[in-house]
């Protein structure tokens, strides 16, 4: 059993995958994320991120993989009709199944039904999560420390990952307008989804800037929020900020399981230490701050 497979077993992720597979086999409705977290005996707060770290794929990608796997199993029956197979595993039509087969398996359903060797090869590849191919066990310098809480002005943005600087610019423009821009103390961010798994323009992110304790209210869509406070696992990342999610995965995959600590229901955030406009990407620094119980 691989290291990742052991971790999935320990954290209840295997139970989630088995449940999803059972739902597809029985043509049952797929459960909500909160139900999946309960099956894994994990808090729903960080479940999606933990699942991604231990499988290398989102729950949605797992469903897509298992749906194709079940379709291949049903296609092995020579009397099966492609339309019946498609509907049985949850596709809306035979065309939807054909499209998924072409995009992922580079073959049509009919070709896969007729070629037992090709079908078996894909069944073997689809039987394990994408993350089993990961080989990123490198030493991590993680420090557990109690962080002081700090207030930030937050602007939620929905768009391209590369356009986050525009949201930070809007916060800074407001701060300049009220005369506190020179009091900037922290630059932080909270990823509300994973830009690696989203189509272009669908990144959901909270951009945050700290100016100390504010005396005045902030106008919508800006809002106030408190970050930090309590124990955190802190990992210093050096490199492009687009790589922070992968570094977070490594922390959750390789440090957390043997740390003896549990995740706390509070935001995981990135504390940016350098300005990309002033510092080359290769040496940009940011602290990944993971809240712990």
Regions found by a protein language model. Name each.
Residues 3-58, 74-94:
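DNA-binding recognition helix and immediately preceding turn/loop
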Residues 45, 50-53, 61, 65, ...:
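A solvent-exposed interaction/effector surface
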């Amino acid at each position: 059993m691989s290291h990742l497979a052991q971790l999935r077993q320990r954290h209840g992720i295997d139970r989630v995958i088995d449940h999803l597979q059972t739902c597809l086999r029985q043509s049952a409705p797929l459960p909500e994320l909160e139900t999946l977290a309960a099956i894994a005996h994990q808090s729903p707060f960080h479940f999606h991120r933990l699942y991604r770290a231990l499988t290398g794929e989102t729950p949605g990608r797992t469903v897509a993989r298992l749906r194709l796997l079940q379709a291949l199993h049903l296609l092995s029956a020579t009397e099966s009709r492609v339309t019946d197979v498609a509907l049985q595993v949850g596709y809306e039509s035979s065309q939807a199944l054909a499209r998924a087969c072409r995009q992922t398996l580079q073959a049509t359903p009919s070709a896969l039904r007729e070629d037992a060797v090709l079908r078996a090869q894909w069944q073997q590849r689809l039987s394990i999560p994408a993350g089993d191919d990961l080989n990123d066990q490198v030493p991590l310098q993680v420090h557990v420390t109690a962080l002081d809480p700090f207030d930030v002005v937050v602007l939620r943005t929905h768009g391209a990952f590369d356009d986050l600087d525009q949201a930070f610019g809007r916060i800074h423009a407001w701060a300049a307008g009220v005369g506190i821009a020179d009091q900037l103390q922290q630059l932080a961010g909270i990823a509300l989804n994973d830009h690696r798994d989203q189509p272009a323009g669908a990144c959901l992110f909270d951009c945050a800037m700290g100016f100390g304790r504010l005396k005045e209210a902030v106008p919508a869509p800006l809002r106030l929020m408190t970050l930090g406070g309590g124990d955190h696992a802190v990992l210093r990342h050096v490199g492009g900020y687009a790589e922070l999610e992968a570094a977070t995965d490594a922390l959750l995959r390789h440090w957390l399981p043997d740390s003896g600590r549990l995740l706390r229901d509070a935001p995981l955030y990135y504390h940016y230490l350098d300005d990309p406009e002033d510092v080359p990407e290769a040496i940009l620094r940011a602290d990944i701050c993971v809240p712990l119980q």
